[in-house]
Amino acid sequence: MTSYLDAVNHRNATAVSAPNTKRKLDDYADDLSSEYLVSCPVRMRKDQPLPSSPTDFHLRSTSGASDCRSSSSSDAACSTSSSPGSAPYAESTRVFGRLQFFVRLLSGGNTLVIHADFDDTVKSIHEKIQDSTGIPVTEQRLIYRGKQLQWEQTLAECDIQNDAGLQLVARMRSTGYPQAWQLINDMVSEIFVLCKTEYPQPTQRIRKILKEFLGNTPQTDVFKASEYLQIFLLSRAPTALVMLYASPVKANRDCASDSIRLFIVSSKTILSKPIYLQFAPIIIEFCMLLNRAAGTKDPVYCLCRSSLGSIVESVGIGCGVGSDKLLVRMQDIFPFVRELATKISEDLGTSMDRLMGPSETDVRDFIAFMLPVKKVIVDGVASDGKITLPLREERNSGRGKYSLCYRDEIKLLHSIFLDLLEKMEQCLKKMEVRLESREKGETTPVVPGCCQYLAILKELNSIAERFKGAQKIFWEMMRLRKASFSYLVVRFAKRNDDHHWIMKHKEVTTFEARRHLAMLILPEVKDEYEDLHEMLIDRSQLLSESFEYIAHAEPETLRGGLFMEFKNEEATGPGVLREWFFFVCQAIFNPQNALYMCCTNDRRRFFPNPASKVNQLHLEYFNFSGRVIALALMHKIQIGIVFDRVFFLQLAGKEISLEDIRDADPFLYNSCKQILEMDPEIVDQDVLGLTFIREAEELESREIIELCPNGRSTIVTSKNRKQYVDLLIRHCFVTSIAEQVTHFAQGFTDIIGSSELQKSFFQGLDLEDLDWILHGSETPISVEDWKANTDYNGFKESDPQISWFWKIVGRMTAEQRKVLLFFWTSIKYLPVEGFGGLASRLCIYKSTESFDRLPSSHTCFYRLCFPPYPSKDIMKDRLNFITQEHVGSSFGTW
């Protein structure tokens, strides 16, 4: 069994910047020649396990001695007996005093000059060799005249003479993986042949060996896999591959690059996850060597660093200090945190003026390495999850001791936070200047290279959560940079990412940002027509038939998309779907259907009718209405309906206060205000005659409801009046409609996917936000905005028909314009951005029909069609006809 031992200083360094670092490959280029890595036998004892970490071999030898000189003195052989008395040395002639001899290191290696006394033991010589080379005593064998020297013998007993030549070979141990050792040794040998050859021609052999080595890794036993993978490190394979990568010959560099990439990438696909995690020490070794040989910008180094980041994200890092059993420790990975933070900081500083900002790879790796670092620091240092700076000099056991272990890391982490936050503040400030320029019509790009800003801010917020007072600093900065922060949210927040950290601080965002995040929670509308949920509905039975189609469908089917068609009408497509949404929502919230009540002060606002719970079918209609509202939001259709605050807050899982009922019941609101503001003495005189009860009407009958135990006999006083008002409001607007709200929320949840997402949707919005999303714009339709967002097909803007059209529209009433818009697009209410917020621009299409025909529309495409009417009066007559409510709202009928 042979093993290739290198001559490189390899003191088990585990991080790029660890204290005991390895020399750069440039510094020991001569050491890395193939004549220093030679084949030698290695004997392994069955009872001796593989080392837990690679052994260090640092060769320090005389450069002049290239050959061993054999002694011509005594022919007496060294005794192999373990007993000194059995050695036949008594008759030998000995010269007492100092002795000089040579030890040739391994087969064909350098030679050491050893000075010793004749009575020194062989073991002491082994120890000198270890001090000089780093090769452990247990790994050495000394051969002289064909025989192995025993530790207990003296040099005199072995008949070592001046200028004698000894051969050092490695001790062979038994191993359970001889094929793996042979594979890697063959690969290392191949590499050194390539490095030594003047014109190398690399083959696929190295790649083949690496794939075979990975393929033979034990897949079911983590311990065996770890032992197996150690062979790769013990054989110095990473050093050999990096040496090949550092070769001045391009063919060698390409071969090494391909081989290392193959090994790193294939390990993740070939090995199961538990086994792949044992790969961490190998990747750390590659990172360390590549950093020294090629630098942190090298693509192969970046690949290894990213792979290590994905591992530490999964396995974490050890929280102990000095444990050899940990796969990855803090000191292994914190140098990567420092390196990446420095790189990101530099890139942020230049991104304000260049097209390139921090790279996605750097930011992703930074976040990956930070995850276990934050966990270890917080778990070990702060009992309450927050770190207070400056750190106290705690020297007691437990967390205080742990705190001292990571004092430098904690300080550095806080410095990283402050530095990156300052750089981000500068970037956001410059973004706002450019955003203002864009609003003025300038074409200046916002900030080139800003695509990673949001991810960096998210990580900074996560770091801030670990330090007392840091979050206040972070969110105050976000408040000052609200415009640029919101721009990043709208531009770069993606579906399926975690945005709770933003939604919890919605006050530092704009409506556009809050709407964007809310819409990301909703399912995405799919375009696969074969998976659409088809509905054929009679207009005269709109509500009941819609209920049957929606309430009894599987939620997954509804999330897949809708296909809508009215009976006896040929029109289909998105336009008809928009029309159906508008009319079915108007029917659901029609007070005559007794499901919802409108607010006295704002008749656009609705909340569940408390009396509707008496009918079980009504409760099912609340589930149906929850589904319909979620689908309308999902399809981005404004329906002209808004919720009252008491309804909205309950959907968000929040408490109801007195101020929240102002619109829903102004009479009760004023009464409660008076009770709370009355003189305490008057209240205590029982002038009001109130007790903790409520009189409620239900199905034309009155019912007395106690607001608390013994409510009938509990008099309202100045001390308990606040409690009375709170209980009264809770019963009127929470308890009385709890079942209806629960059914609506369940219907909404059916579409959105979970109750947590349902609450997050409403919690991330203000009531006014939902008004604008669900109801749409409340400002009168602007003809100028309409005109600016309309294209022409067949007509030119300068044609008289186009001029007549806009003049006629300009003189229409607000209601006529709404009807015309609905006829044209099936949209009754525009988005808050106006026509610019629609999915596409509108179009006036020139038809070839006769002049006596009315205009027609293709609502799916926002297209209005009419012939080139010969006069303005004729056009006005035709447009007046289609802007009658009964015509515009019945588009598509036969």
Predicted regions and their residues:
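Short, contiguous acidic and Ser/Thr-rich linear segments
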Residues: 106-127, 149-153
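Long, Ser/Thr/Pro/Gly-rich and/or acidic low-complexity regions in intracellular
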Residues: 138, 358-361, 391-894
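Eukaryotic mixed-charge, acidic/polar low-complexity intrinsically disordered regions
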Residues: 145-171
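Short amphipathic, charge-patterned alpha-helical segments
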Residues: 115-140, 163, 584
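Long, low-complexity, acidic Ser/Pro/Gly-rich intrinsically disordered regulatory segments
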Residues: 5-48, 53-56, 60-66, 70-71, ...
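Short, intrinsically disordered linker segments that flank or connect zinc-binding domains
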Residues: 88-91, 113, 794
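Short structural boundary motif marking the start of a folded domain
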Residues: 96-102, 112
